[in-house]
């Protein structure tokens, strides 16, 4: 990616040839890489500085393109905002059912109604936040129109890559870790969402506010929440029921589940590697 970044200085970017070979997106990817690497086993002292550098580059010229209304948020998720700099991607479940979002057949009655969200997640919002009406139709209840504001909400698992909002939040977090103006950057992001300010926050309270904004902004957005939990050592608890059997599952900070299993085809093609600790081979 660093080579691609250098190449962009002398080579014209053509989206008709490659959607990823564009300065804004290459810088965004580099910001993501250094952001996650900074808390990994491969971390280096310069990681957050690099994350801040590339995140700042990924926010250049995008401020006026970020939606500041609920209707604007819905337009992005429906791919109806041609000026939005993110890259809209249709999920492979398009036209079928998607486990993350629910059912695409809601209009036929095949979809759960009045789905509750985690109470502590709901408590992060104020009604003035533009995401509130996009996410909820009643206190603590997921809106049927989510995520795109349509009559039934498109539940195809589509997503938007390279959201400029993510670049702002990476920048705020990186500046927090490098004693930069994290509050100012976070306030800029909050202004897009009418979500108050971070004035007066410092230390762990400021970091938690940044993580809270990530949690709110990236609700059910690919694996972002999972990466945050993995990055900062969160504990996951779930009470699940399958075929009338209940399971209480807790994934602790150092649990093996945070290192995902290596796919079977990779194990079969490379006998020099072994499955990650804790995972057992399932044969069908």
Each model region followed by its residue ranges:
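Acidic/Gly/His-enriched mid-domain segments of enzyme catalytic cores or analogous surface patches
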Residues: 112-118
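Aromatic (Trp/Tyr) and acidic
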Residues: 107-109
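Acidic/polar-rich alpha-helix caps and helix-coil junctions
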Residues: 1-101, 122-284
